[in-house]
Structures are given as structure tokens and as C-alpha cells.
Amino acid sequence: MTERENNVYKAKLAEQAERYDEMVEAMKKVASMDVELTVEERNLLSVAYKNVIGARRASWRIITSIEQKEENKGAEEKLEMIKTYRGQVEKELRDICSDILNVLEKHLIPCATSGESKVFYYKMKGDYHRYLAEFATGSDRKDAAENSLIAYKAASDIAMNDLPPTHPIRLGLALNFSVFYYEILNSPDRACRLAKAAFDDAIAELDTLSEESYKDSTLIMQLLRDNLTLWTSDMQAEEVDPNAGDGEPKEQIQDVEDQDVS
């Protein structure tokens, strides 16, 4: 086996063993060869990072939720411990995001030649800046949000020209970009417009849906519709009562990283 094949096989082994940190290392070696990745290699890289970041994002949400409960009780000593612990998780999140963003910037985006791979990588860039914006504050949050917006817009411009509306990567981009508008920019109107346009465009061209991407595309369309339903009901509730939902746990908004699709 060549070095490239060797690392791809290592990544597959690590995935089966659920050792995602090692999967990341193997696929980073492939990415650093400065070649255009195959669809399989690209998906392995995405799955590896999705799992290492996903575990920390879930931890951060749980810790933040506990922190809010303890704040309501006024438990100062516990709050100090929680803040320190949250800081550790945030450092891990920052390190993972800066790692993949570096790989994208130095190797993957410069070597991408097809429209599909460019959309895939710019979407990834938008996603990982969005993950930074989820927990950052002040100017760090502003910078992460701006970088995310620029990357998502670059991906969207290419997707509109090069990919059909039913393509799972174009649909996944629309899903995550709309979540960015809703959660990071607090712009439910734009989030709903983007999600609805992507869903409607895909419905109008359902006959172009290829057999191999049918499952992924229809799953993402369902997620777009689920988010639209959730967002419109939230917006209607706020119109009736501006304080609706304050202090209540919110239903989880779905993005494509929460699902088993790439």
C-alpha cells in the first residue's frame, strides 16, 4: 500500500474502533499531501472532525446548562468550578477548530478543483467558525461570525452555479447556513427565508434526484422542514408574548453535523 492508502485504511480502522482522534491524525496526513481528496477521503476527514468536535460541543451545552441552574441558586463555590471546567472544554473546542481551519486553508481549499469539493470545504470552514462563535464572546465572537458568514457565502455562490438544488452538499450547506443566521446572527427571518428557498427549490426539481443521494437529500430536506416549523412557531409565540420561552429549555435545532450525513 502507498502511504496515502495506508493512512486512509488507518482512518477506516480508527472509525470502526471509534477512536476519532486517531482518525483525525490519519486523515490530516492525507490532506497534507496537497492532493485533491477523493469523495471517500473527504467524507472520512469530515466524519473524523465531526466526531471529535461533536463530543465537545455536547459537553459544552451540558456544562452551560448546569451553570445556568447553579447561577439561579446563587452557588458561588460551585460556579467557580463549573466556569473553570467550561474553560477547559472551550480550549479543546478552540484547538480542534483552529486545527481543521488550518488544514482547510493550507491544503484542502487550494487543492480543490471541482465545484463540489470547493462547496464542501467552504461549508466546513463556515461550520468550524460557527462552532467558535457558539461559545466565544466580545470581539472573538464577532470575528468568528464574520469569518463564518464569508465562508458560507463563498460556498453558496459556487453551489448556486455548480450543484443542482437537490444535491446533498448544497442542501446541507443551506441547512447549516440557515442555522448560522438563526443561532449566531439572531436573524430568524433570514434563516427561514434561506431554509424555505432551499426546500422549495429542491421540491421543484425532485425528478433530478439521483438514486445514490436520495437518502441523504431527503433527510436534509426533512431537517430543513423541521427547523422551519420550529422557527416559525417560536416567532409566532414571541409576537404574542415577547417573553415567551424565557428560562425554558429550547428544542434542539438540527444542523447537518447532528446527522449521519456528510
From Swiss-Prot:
Gene3D superfamilies reported in the protein's UniProt record: 14-3-3 domain
A single GO molecular-function term is:
protein heterodimerization activity
Keyword Phosphoprotein (UniProt):
yes
Region of interest (Disordered), ranges: 236-262
Gene Ontology biological process terms, A to Z: axon guidance; determination of adult lifespan; DNA damage checkpoint signaling; germ cell migration; germarium-derived oocyte fate determination; microtubule sliding; negative regulation of neuron projection arborization; oocyte microtubule cytoskeleton polarization
A family per Pfam: 14-3-3
Q: Which residues form a coiled coil?
A: none
Instruction: Please give the start and end residues of each transmembrane region.
Output: none
Modified residues annotated as Phosphoserine in this record = 262
Which UniProt keyword terms apply here? Phosphoprotein
- A GO CC annotation given for this chain: plasma membrane
Impact of changing residue 199 to Y on the protein?
Suppressor of sev-Ras1 V12
Q: Which InterPro entries match?
A: 14-3-3, 14-3-3_CS, 14-3-3_dom_sf, 14-3-3_domain
Q: How does it assemble?
A: Homodimer. Interacts with phosphorylated yki. Interacts with pav (when serine phosphorylated); the interaction is necessary for association of the complex pav-14-3-3epsilon complex to the microtubules, thereby inhibiting microtubule sliding.
Give the function comment from the record. Answer: Positively regulates Ras-mediated pathways. Acts downstream or parallel to Raf, but upstream of nuclear factors in Ras signaling. Three mutants have been isolated, that suppress the rough eye phenotype caused by mutated Ras1 (sev-Ras1 v12). Inhibits yki activity by restricting its nuclear localization. Together with pav, has a role in the inhibition of microtubule sliding during neurite outgrowth.
Q: What is this protein called?
A: 14-3-3 protein epsilon
What is the species of this protein? Drosophila melanogaster
What gene name is given for the protein in this entry?
Answer: 14-3-3epsilon
